[in-house]
Amino acid sequence: MPQNYNDTIHKMATPFEMRAGLPKKEPKMLEDWEKNHVYEKMIEHNADLPRFVLHDGPPYANGNIHMGTALNKIIKDIIIREKNMSGYCAPYVPGYDTHGLPIELKALSSLGDKKAGISKLELRKICKEFATEHIDVMNSQFARLGVQGDFANPYLTLRPEFEARQVEIFGEMAKKGYIYKGMKAVYWCPEDRTALAEAEIEYAEDECDSIYVRFKLTDDPNGVLAKYGIPLDKAWIVIWTTTTWTLPANVATCLNPSLEYAFVKIGDEYHLMAAGLVESTMKACHIEDYEVLEPRVLGSEFELMQYQHPFLDRKGLVILGDHVTLEGGTGCVHTAPGHGVEDFEVCVNHYPQVPVIVPVDDGGYLTEEAGKEFAGLKVWAANKVILEHIKQSGHLMGVQHITHQYPHCWRCHHPIIFRATEQWFCSIDKFREEAYKAIDEVKWQPAWGHDRMHGMVRDRSDWCISRQRVWGVPIPVFYCKNCGKYHITDASIKAVSDLFRKEGSDAWYKYDANEIMPKTEVCECGASDWEKDPDIMDVWFDSGSTWSAVCRERPELNWPADLYMEGADQFRGWFQSSLLTSVATQGVAPYKGVLCHGWVVDEQGKQMHKSAGNGVEPSEIIRDYGADIVRLWVASSDYTVDVRAGKNIFKQLSEAYRKMRNTARFMLGNIGDFNPATDMVDEDQLFEIDRWALKSCNSLTANVRAAYDNYDFSRAYHAIYNFCVIDMSNFYMDVIKDRLYCADEHARRCAQTALYRILVDFTKLVAPILCFTAQEIWSYIPKLEGMQEYVCWERMPEAKSDEDAAFDAKWAKIIAVRDDVKKALEQARADKTIGSSLEAAVTLYCSDEMYDFLNAIPMDELADLMIVSHVDLVKGEGGVRGLTEGLGMSVAHAAGNKCLRCWKFDTAVGEDGLCPRCAKVLG
């Protein structure tokens, strides 16, 4: 009866399970980390190291996190974890944006019919409760993703000390002359009844009427019409617009002074338009019978002509502006300064005689000033009514129904309007050049971020910082009741900031203006009776103040921050508002580096929408796979562009994770009896393939560390994955199995030494990405003295300078030969010549150079490399050619009998069923 040698084999054994079970394990690990203050002790341990500050851009505290939030927070966490393991003290202070319209609207919605009589203080109380409630929810959701940080003490924009510092920044900017109050055409949300900043605008497709309207010319003070033989009573000027509702606000028509204009004769009437747009205008108006008159006339000649408004009892003025182009329309631009930025600027700056008319109230309804027949209509409803009116009156020349990109409020997602109102502004022109210099000093990743930010600052208008709402930091300005002038001084700002620091911004609504304003403050007119500004600050001013209210105030942080990292939409949001407030008050950018990521889209690259049913939630993925798979998704993605997410993608990633986990499991399973303090073999005593494996791990370390330094996590992931699958599973671990299970003590300890050293470094390298799995692996690794209990407390491995071109070339050649032999073995298996590869004897037909190369390797080692029982070398051609030059192969069934212990075939297997090697080991 054959003997059983199973008990003589060193079998793989480890409590580290093949099935990860992350959804159940991770919460227990989180409990352990919290109980043992792992994050706090890490920061304390690193306290004397150089500081690295990634300043958290505050997410809005109004709901559950989504895949975009998860992407953002995990990128930050990978950076923070890696820095803390790489010789830095990198504290992470999360923050929350807690003021603003979404919270106020939800608070109002919760009140139902009671909202009509509620006071501002009562409403603010409900808003605060809503925000703080969601902070707790979001804190727990971020922690579930494995994000480390000071979640017990996040920064909140509603905290008194934050609000006080924000008021002081406002005061500093006002003192420098950067803050002013003025009337301008600003983005206005009729649904929310408030002004908006550029950063609060999103664009979406909208359908509208594109109309061509003619205005009857009435006055020709320069005699231009007579000069060219055009009768005034038959002369018209033609405009084009897609906002029919703004026609009641028309007070001027703008021409480019340098463009050529022509009169187009239609019947017995003459219509003025840009010569270069005649054909497209006639086509759009479906007019075929027309005549373009000569000569062409420069737009400058028509300045100050007048025309009759199509339905109101007033005249409009022909004015000039360089913003008029030939890109579309008629070259004669309908100008309503009450509802257009360029319209407002050209009129106010160059034609002060032109009135600014705003016949629309804050809810988007036309007023009596628009005409009695239109009063009370919402602007969108007014479009059709006005269109029908000008059609009946003979002023409409043509209409097309088009789809175009139109600005919408990013909160309520309704279309917005431009509306000239009195607002508070930050004058960008006064420090724009300083901002350019600050932008140049920042490291932008990707590099295109520099030009994007530069272009946005270059092209932007003054920043509208006031909002007509309740839930926010009040505009800290007082008005003299006697003369109406506003009053901002060092003393008034200090009084407000001191009050807010003590009681919070609710105090603005609690006390009368005269109770807040210092008694020493007197208006220029001599009066000292005050009232408060009713508006609040733009929430972008809130978050744009975090560099001061957080980074400069919290002792564990630094300013300027080393890094700001957010989505690409923050170039017009937080990146920009922070830059503007910092440059305005300090003259420098608030950050040394800026890193940005793209949007999360579905598997087809489309935006995720609940209505489309193509979204995935972080909670779903965590429930099904675990948070480490979400983290792996982040690390495996090129986050600088849009990142795809979907169930198929996570399924594929779970397979990739399984391969990496099993690589670690193999290593753990084969070092269970290894004591690194006593069993470690010196490197120069290791087998050459063990040294190759360590060298491969060293290359991995160099590549991954470089990738981390550049925040290129997908490069790190692919290096780790390829190392696990190609270098380890497919080659090294495959080759050393026999040595681990069946060889003598020294040979086995050599392999274990390599595995141990590789596993320690590998676990550290993956720890920033797979924080849960890395800690699980780490808990099973036998520890040397000085090794930490938690892997995140460890230092990253350092890549050694171990360049050895000859060694690398040799092993590259060995692997190439092995790959060819593996293919030959697969064919032999398909031909039923062999079953397992250990049944094979391989003959290698070699060129002289290849023979000398392979013959230098002991044949038993060569057979182990190929995982066959026997290898013969023959000079000359023969067998099947592979990809390796100078090599042919043939495979036959190995001679001899199968060793009952190691399963190799050998002609010297004894009666006990053992090959000589196994017999010696059991000796």
Region spans (language model):
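Short cysteine-rich clusters marking metal-coordination/redox-active sites
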Residues: 189, 409, 480, 520-524, ...
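Alpha-helical recognition segments enriched in aromatics with Gly/Pro capping
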Residues: 219, 316, 350-363, 469-471, ...
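Protease-associated
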Residues: 252, 259-332, 341-345
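Acidic, turn-prone loop/beta-hairpin segments
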Residues: 97, 186, 190, 196-204, ...
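Secondary-structure capping and boundary motifs in well-ordered enzyme cores
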Residues: 46, 50-57, 68-71, 75, ...
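Residue patterns forming the tRNA-binding/recognition surfaces of aminoacyl-tRNA synthetases
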Residues: 2-10, 15-22, 28, 32-36, ...
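Cys/His-coordinated zinc-binding microdomains
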Residues: 193, 468, 484, 524-527, ...
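N-terminal catalytic cores of NTP/NDP-binding nucleotidyl/phosphoryl-transfer enzymes
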Residues: 44-106, 239-247, 254, 319-346, ...
